[in-house]
């Protein structure tokens, strides 16, 4: 494990010097920035005392506006006022145009097919729009904290892919902001509640925002969060509650929602009523429209009846996510509530009824993600108690396992920040194989012989199936202390075996540097050796499979056919001993052509045996 001390070049790290770092919740609807001050993580307000910044950017002829100012024009200048840009991150223009949702923007395609918004300020891409949202948040943080930032932790949805994550990092880098880490939003929420320290088990994060709903099922093990399943609805949120309540009020007052200007006023009043009903049982809705005043008393029961179906949809998504994760609701230790819409009493009561315990709600659900990100940022820049080392841990050399032919399959790449968990599936090589040996290695080379051996262990109790039929999931997990745990589990039976090792033990910085230099020096040679080894493994697999097939069904072949196949097998076995990968591939292809007829006969024979004794009606 590489332990990188955080300090200016030529200076020692000063434990007493507080380094400025922030956590940013770059949300679909709203964004926030938070920092740890005097030991407490808090969101930062702007000059007007507002903590939340609407994630809206307007590109007008006279300039660019962001947040509340841009929001004022979202209805009157929709074509140039970009909302929910997070939905466009990492997506191609073709994907957007193929979707069912229609947008008021004028799009063009970039050279690589990504969307460009055509605005009075010129063409801008989603990364640039996101940077404009980040800009006032960064400025707010530097003004409040009184100095330049050393970096930021930015949160992203757990389901974001590599392109979406990279786009988020690029947005920060456009502003010259160092991204300390991208943190999954549900993980940030769990960190805010301190669930990352000491507790182990399954955690659910229920995130109901203004426009989207997300449910994440996480497993926490020794400080590492593993995302087991995600789900939700990208078109369901608190705004839908407002629309239902606004429609109800319009109906009670005999108003037509199609009337110009009425819709926005109704939505504003509906939101006020919704928020008031979280604290009281009855609220009077009021509206002044076209010189007339309207009033109507609404109780919580009426509101609950209006939104009940939508809340049930979120619970159904929770049920699906648990099923995908293979978890029962009773196994969930804690449920974390995220998003302003989780303040609605019906939402909280339904979540409590489903999971069987009261959810965690003590931290403002609008701010919990930003607060968790701020805590993580504070740790990453080294703001720990004086007794602690100021360390940023990364994996200095890739971690992997040996596969057939002495090859290395890398599971965790070097320079990955820890804690981390990665998993990959493997299968058996021989028919009836009931055990599998695992060799854990470290290094950047392609062959095991050139890497560092860390540990060996064996998984026993694999069902005796045909080669390739068993599924063994291998999980590498590195905790915050650099301890590597490798677990192998056969999926159908659940039988497992594991081992722990400290990858950094006995490795000096010089040895790490030497291993990296060797990997670059021998890169071309290593690739050639890997290609040869892969062909040799494939040859062995083909021969093993054919030996098994002939042992069962050689009676299907004439003597001449059997001799031809045997000769081709002998040729492949001989060629595979050499060092010509292309020659081995050619021999495999010749043997494949030679056995086509045999494969067809075996298939016909299997079908005849399966149908033997079956009537037409049964079939």
Curated annotation (Swiss-Prot):
Protein name: Chaperone protein HscA homolog
Family classification: Belongs to the heat shock protein 70 family.
Keyword presence, Transcription regulation: no
GO BP terms in the entry: iron-sulfur cluster assembly
PROSITE patterns: HSP70_1, HSP70_2
GO MF term list: ATP binding; ATP hydrolysis activity; ATP-dependent protein folding chaperone; unfolded protein binding
Job description of the protein: Chaperone involved in the maturation of iron-sulfur cluster-containing proteins. Has a low intrinsic ATPase activity which is markedly stimulated by HscB.
Name of a matching Pfam family: HSP70
Residues passing through the membrane, by range: none
Protein origin, superkingdom: Bacteria
InterPro entries: ATPase_NBD, Heat_shock_70_CS, HscA_NBD, HSP70_C_sf, HSP70_peptide-bd_sf, Hsp_70_fam, ISC_FeS_clus_asmbl_HscA
Keywords from the UniProt entry: ATP-binding, Chaperone, Nucleotide-binding
């Amino acid at each position: 494990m590489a332990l990188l001390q955080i300090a200016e070049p030529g200076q020692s790290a000063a434990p007493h010097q507080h380094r400025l770092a922030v956590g940013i919740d770059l949300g679909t609807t709203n964004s926030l920035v938070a920092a740890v001050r005097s030991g407490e993580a808090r969101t930062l307000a702007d000059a007007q005392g507002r903590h939340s910044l609407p994630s809206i950017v307007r590109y007008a002829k006279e300039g660019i506006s962001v947040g509340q100012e841009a929001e004022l024009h979202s209805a009157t200048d929709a074509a140039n006022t970009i909302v929910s840009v997070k939905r466009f991150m990492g997506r191609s223009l073709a994907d957007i145009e193929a979707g069912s949702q229609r947008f008021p923007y004028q799009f063009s395609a970039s050279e690589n097919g990504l969307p460009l918004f055509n605005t009075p300020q010129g063409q801008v891409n989603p990364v640039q729009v996101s940077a404009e949202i980040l800009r006032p948040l960064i400025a707010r943080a530097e003004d409040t904290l009184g100095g330049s930032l050393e970096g930021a932790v930015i949160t992203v949805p757990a389901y974001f892919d590599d392109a979406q994550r990279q786009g988020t990092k690029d947005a920060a880098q456009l502003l010259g902001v160092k991204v300390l880490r991208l943190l999954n939003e549900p993980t940030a929420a769990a960190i805010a509640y301190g669930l990352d320290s000491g507790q182990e088990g399954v955690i659910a994060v229920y995130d109901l925002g203004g426009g989207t709903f997300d449910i994440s099922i996480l497993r926490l093990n020794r400080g590492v969060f593993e995302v087991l399943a995600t789900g939700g609805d990208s078109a369901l949120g608190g705004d839908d509650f407002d629309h239902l309540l606004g429609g109800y009020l319009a109906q009670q007052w005999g108003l037509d929602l199609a009337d110009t200007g009425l819709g926005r006023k109704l939505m504003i009043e509906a939101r006020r009523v919704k928020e008031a009903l979280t604290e009281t049982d009855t609220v009077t809705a009021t509206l002044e429209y076209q010189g007339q005043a309207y009033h109507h008393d609404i109780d919580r029961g009426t509101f609950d009846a209006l939104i009940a179906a939508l809340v049930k949809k979120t619970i159904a998504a929770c049920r699906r996510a648990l099923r995908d994760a293979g978890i029962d609701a009773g196994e969930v230790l804690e449920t974390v509530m995220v998003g302003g819409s989780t303040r609605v009493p019906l939402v909280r009561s339904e979540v409590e009824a489903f999971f069987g315990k009261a959810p965690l709600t003590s931290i403002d659900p609008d701010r919990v993600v930003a607060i968790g990100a701020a805590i993580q940022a504070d740790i990453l820049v080294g703001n720990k108690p004086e007794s602690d080392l100021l360390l940023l841990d990364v994996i200095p050399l890739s971690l992997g396992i040996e596969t057939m032919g002495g090859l290395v399959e890398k599971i965790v790449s070097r320079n990955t920040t820890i804690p981390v968990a990665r998993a990959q599936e493997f299968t058996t090589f021989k028919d009836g194989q009931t055990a599998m040996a695992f060799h854990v290695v470290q290094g950047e080379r392609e062959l095991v012989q050139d890497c560092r051996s860390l540990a060996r262990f064996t998984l026993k109790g694999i069902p005796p199936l045909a080669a390739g039929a068993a599924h063994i999931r291998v999980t590498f997990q590195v905790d915050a202390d650099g301890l590597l745990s490798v677990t192998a589990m056969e999926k159908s039976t659940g039988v497992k075996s594991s081992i722990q090792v400290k990858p950094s033990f006995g490795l000096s910085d010089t040895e790490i540097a030497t291993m990296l230099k060797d990997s670059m020096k021998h890169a071309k040679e290593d690739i050639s050796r890997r290609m040869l080894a892969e062909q040799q493994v494939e040859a062995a697999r083909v021969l093993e499979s054919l030996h098994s097939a002939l042992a069962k069904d050689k009676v299907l072949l004439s003597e001449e056919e059997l001799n031809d196949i045997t000769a081709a097998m002998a040729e492949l076995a001989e060629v595979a001993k050499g060092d010509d990968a292309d020659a081995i591939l050619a021999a495999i292809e010749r043997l494949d052509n030679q056995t086509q007829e045999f494969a067809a006969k075996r298939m016909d024979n299997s079908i005849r045996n399966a149908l033997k004794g079956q009537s037409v009606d049964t079939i």
